[in-house]
């Protein structure tokens, strides 16, 4: 049913719970897991800079992949850099490109204050995705 599961991680407690849920579902359905972290890059006047270091972003994905693999489940992942406000689009695009059957996300992330003004990434993904989205609380 869910052969390919995408889990979005951002280092929040909510995304850690989503990662655990993706592992449990992958074990139940003999699925593989694709871990994604979308890093927003602010485009300043002279250069683009990430809102977190590339090393931190890569470590976040690598740690999540290791957690999944340590559970005996095949896992891959990537860090995707996007302009601010385009995180949901990047997650949905990755889900389409990777032929994902289920997206798993936390109900909140690290950017909750900004979400009050522009809408949450999770809400946008649930509206845009062509596959089921499991929102873990």
What are these regions (language model features)?
Residues 69-103:
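Structural beta-alpha unit
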Residues 102-127:
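Glycine-rich, Arg-bearing micro-motifs that act as flexible, cationic patches
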């Amino acid at each position: 049913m869910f052969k390919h599961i995408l889990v979005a991680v951002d280092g929040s407690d909510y995304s850690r719970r989503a990662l655990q849920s993706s592992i449990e579902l992958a074990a139940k359905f003999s699925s593989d897991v694709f871990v994604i972290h979308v890093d927003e890059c602010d485009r300043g006047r002279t250069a683009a800079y990430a809102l977190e270091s590339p090393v931190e972003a890569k470590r976040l994905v690598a740690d999540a992949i290791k957690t999944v693999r340590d559970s005996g489940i095949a896992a891959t992942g990537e860090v995707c850099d996007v302009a601010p406000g385009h995180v949901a689009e990047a997650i949905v695009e990755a889900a389409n490109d990777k032929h994902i059957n289920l997206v798993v996300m936390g109900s909140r992330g690290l950017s909750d204050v900004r979400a009050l003004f522009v809408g949450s990434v999770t809400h946008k993904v649930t509206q845009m995705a062509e596959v089921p989205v499991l929102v873990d609380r």
